[in-house]
Amino acid sequence: MAKMQLSIFIAVVALIVCSASAKTASPPAPVLPPTPAPAPAPENVNLTELLSVAGPFHTFLDYLLSTGVIETFQNQANNTEEGITIFVPKDDAFKAQKNPPLSNLTKDQLKQLVLFHALPHYYSLSEFKNLSQSGPVSTFAGGQYSLKFTDVSGTVRIDSLWTRTKVSSSVFSTDPVAVYQVNRVLLPEAIFGTDVPPMPAPAPAPIVSAPSDSPSVADSEGASSPKSSHKNSGQKLLLAPISMVISGLVALFL
C-alpha cells in the first residue's frame, strides 16, 4: 500500500515537472499592433451652398432648383468614382442673352439647357488640353448635346456652335467636383437648331493720324511772304529806269 502511494506521488510530481518545463520552453505569444482606424470619408461638396456664396450665380442656381437638376448634379458630385464638372454662367450672362431669348423655352428644354452646362466627369484645368484632342464631349443632357474644347496656352475655350466663350476663372476644383465660371450662356444646337445668326463684326479700330513734322500750308505761306515782298520790290526798282528811257525816246520823236 505504501509502495502504491509512493508511486502515485512520484507520478504526480513527474507530471508537474513536465508541465512546468513545457511552459518554460514555449515562446510567448506575439503582441499584435493595434489596427489603425479607417480614414474618414471625404466630406461631400454642397453645390447649392457653394453656388450661393462663390459668386454672382443666382440665376443659374434658380434654374438648377426650379428644374430639379440640382439633385442630379449633387448625386454625381457625391460619386467619387466619376465626379462632375460644371460650367456656371454669371448673372450678367443671362441678362445679356437676348437672341435667342430663354423665356420662350419649354420646361423640358430649360432642363436640357441646364444639363448642357455640366460634364459627368471631373476635369481639372490641365486635363482640358488632352480633352481638346478627343473631339466633341457629351454633356449631362445626352449624346446630341456636346461641347468642343480647345486649349490655347492654358486658356480653355468652349464652342457649342451657338456659343463661343472661355473659362474665365476656377470657382472650385477639388476631385470629384470642378466648378468653372464662363461669361456666356451655353446654347445647344439640339434646342436652337443650326440656323445660327451671324456674329456681329467687331467695331473698327479708331484711326489715329500720326503727327506730321512738315509745316502747314498757312505756315509755308507765312514763311514765304517776306521773300515774295522783297522780290517784288527789286523788280519795281529795276523797271523804273527802263520806263524813264522809253519815255525820253518817245519825246524826241514827237
From Swiss-Prot:
Chief location category: membrane
GO cellular component, one term: mitochondrion
Annotated Low complexity bias: 206-220
Residues in the signal sequence: 1-22
Gene: FLA7
Presence of keyword Membrane: yes
Lipid attachment locations (GPI-anchor amidated asparagine): N232
Region (Disordered): 203-233
Membrane topology: Lipid-anchor; GPI-anchor
Residue positions the entry lists as glycosylated: N46, N78, N104, N130
Compartment(s) where it occurs, according to its Swiss-Prot or TrEMBL record: Cell membrane
Keywords: Cell membrane, Glycoprotein, GPI-anchor, Lipoprotein, Membrane, Proteoglycan, Signal
Comp. bias (Polar residues): 222-233
One family name in Pfam for this protein: Fasciclin
Function field: May be a cell surface adhesion protein.
Propeptide, residue positions: 233-254
The protein's name: Fasciclin-like arabinogalactan protein 7
Family: Belongs to the fasciclin-like AGP family.
